[in-house]
Amino acid sequence: MKLIVSVMPRSLEEAQALSATRYLDADIIEWRADYLPKEAILQVAPAIFEKFAGRELVFTLRTRSEGGEIDLSPEEYIHLIKEVAQFYQPDYIDFEYYSYKDVFEEMLDFPNLVLSYHNFQETPENMMEILSELTILNPKLVKVAVMAHTEQDVLDLMNYTRGFKTLNPEQEYVTISMGKVGKVSRITADVTGSSWSFASLDEVSAPGQISLASMKKIREILDEA
C-alpha cells in the first residue's frame, strides 16, 4: 500500500511555508484545496505544484456535502478542476461522483480520475451498489470512505473491497472505514486489496487517521519476510 498525506493550507502564506522535506516519507501528496477560499485556489496552485515538483500529487476539492470545507456549484467545481488539470497536470484528480454526477461527462477525457464517495455519517447498506457503479465507470481509482460505528461495518467494507478487487484485478481501489473502530481498515489495505492508506503528519484530514510515522512502522512490520 502507498501512504498518502494531505496538505491543507488555508492561505498562500501557509502554502509557501510548507516544508516539502517533511513529507518525504509519504508516497503521494494530496492537496486538499477545499481549505482555501474558492477564489484563492488558482492563486495558490503554483506554490503547491512548485513545492512538490517531482512528487505524485492528488488534487482534491472535498465539498461540504462529503465532509469537506467548501461549497461549489457544478460549474465552479468543473471549472477549478479543469484549470488545475490543464496547467499543472496532477497525477490524480479526485471527483465526487455522487455529488456531481450530472457533469461527470465533462470529465471523460481525463484518464487519471479518482472517483470518490464519502459518507461521514454511516456505512450505507448499499455499499455493494456504490462500489459496483463506480467500478463500471473504469476510473484510474475507486475511492470510498465511510463512517464505521460497529465492528461489522468495518468487516463488511473490507469484505466488499476484497471481493471487488478479486473480480476486477486491474481496477485500483481505496476503501476506508473512518472513525476509531475503523482504524484497522487503514493498516490492512494490502489484505483487502486497497492501494492507498491515508496518514497524517500534523492535522488529520479524516476521523481515525494514523500518523505517518506509525503507518511507516506498521508497513515495515507487515512487509517483513
From Swiss-Prot:
Homodimer. Keywords: Amino-acid biosynthesis, Aromatic amino acid biosynthesis, Lyase, Schiff base. InterPro entries: Aldolase_TIM, DHquinase_I, Type-I_3-dehydroquinase. Pathway: Metabolic intermediate biosynthesis; chorismate biosynthesis; chorismate from D-erythrose 4-phosphate and phosphoenolpyruvate: step 3/7. This is 3-dehydroquinate dehydratase. 3-dehydroquinate binds at S6, E30, W31, R32, R62, R186, S205, Q209. The keyword Amino-acid biosynthesis applies.
